């Protein structure tokens, strides 16, 4: 059971967080749900970012006031 938990945790961590990737990208303005859009774009290339989609959705929802302020 512990091995499964460690494996799933590693998959989520290694997939990266789309919201963080979009926040630290200085070339683009942060928009509402940019992390979710990034995850969906990356999921077309390889399926692992789909695991990060719920986490990016939550973080993007928290960051909505920041996106609106820009």
Curated annotation (Swiss-Prot):
InterPro entries the UniProt entry points to: DUF1375
Organism (species): Haemophilus influenzae (strain ATCC 51907 / DSM 11121 / KW20 / Rd)
Primary location class: membrane
Identification of the protein by name: Uncharacterized protein HI_0650
Domain of life (superkingdom): Bacteria
Lineage: Bacteria, Pseudomonadati, Pseudomonadota, Gammaproteobacteria, Pasteurellales
Ranges that cross the membrane: 4-24, 48-68
Subcellular location: Cell membrane
Keyword entries, A-Z: Cell membrane, Membrane, Transmembrane, Transmembrane helix
A GO cellular-component term linked to this record: plasma membrane
Membrane topology: Multi-pass membrane protein
Pfam family for this entry, one: DUF1375
């Amino acid at each position: 059971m512990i091995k499964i938990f460690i494996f799933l945790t590693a998959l989520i961590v290694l997939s990266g967080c789309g919201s963080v990737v979009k926040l630290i990208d200085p070339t683009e303005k942060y928009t509402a749900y940019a992390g979710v859009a990034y995850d969906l774009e990356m999921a077309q290339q390889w399926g692992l970012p789909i695991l990060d989609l719920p986490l990016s959705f939550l973080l993007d929802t928290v960051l909505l006031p920041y996106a609106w302020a820009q």
